[in-house]
């Protein structure tokens, strides 16, 4: 009887140890996945000196007047650093960063739509579509937003498809 209790006690400890190892493995897996997602975002997002959107304040676009951010008000979201013009915009971004983060990693939406290519943007050439910020290249007479506006639905579908392929 005593040896039966010892045997059952060992089995229980073995099962507990296996459960512990499984949980530990899952935790490491989740952490590794999160790091991989951040690394992918850093590789694929449009940043200069580690800062997105050419240092423009993502929240300011939604008030209709994009302004440059200040390094004093910054936030790192999933590996991407954003600057904000003031503390209020910083706090607003923190509440719902996915709302304010630009589409297609902050690259020119028109070019992502055409062929998945990533080119820099002019931070004051933008359009908010379905509540999402889209940025565009614009220099001299080459304004990609004007081209986008000619066939927005088709281009948006192409940009979504190309961006998803790049991120996965």
Task: Locate each region found by the language model.
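N-terminal secretory signal peptides that target proteins for export/translocation
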Residues: 1-16
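N-terminal cationic amphipathic segment used for targeting or macromolecule association
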Residues: 13, 29-34, 157
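Bacterial N-terminal signal peptides
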Residues: 20-29
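Charged, low-complexity intrinsically disordered segments
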Residues: 35-168
């Amino acid at each position: 009887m005593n040896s039966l209790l010892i045997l059952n006690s060992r089995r229980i400890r073995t099962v507990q140890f296996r459960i512990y190892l499984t949980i530990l493995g899952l935790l490491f897996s989740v952490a590794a996945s999160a790091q991989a997602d951040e690394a992918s975002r850093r590789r694929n997002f449009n940043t200069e000196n580690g800062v997105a959107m050419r240092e423009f304040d993502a929240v300011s676009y939604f008030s209709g007047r994009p302004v440059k951010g200040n390094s004093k008000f910054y936030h790192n979201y999933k590996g991407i650093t954003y600057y904000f013009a003031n503390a209020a915009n910083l706090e607003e971004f923190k509440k719902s960063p996915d709302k304010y983060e630009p589409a297609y990693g902050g690259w020119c939406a028109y070019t992502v739509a055409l062929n998945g290519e990533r080119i820099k943007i002019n931070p004051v050439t933008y359009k908010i579509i379905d509540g999402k910020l889209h940025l565009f290249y614009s220099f001299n007479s080459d304004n990609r937003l004007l081209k986008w506006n000619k066939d927005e639905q088709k281009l948006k579908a192409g940009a979504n498809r190309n961006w998803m392929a790049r991120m996965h």
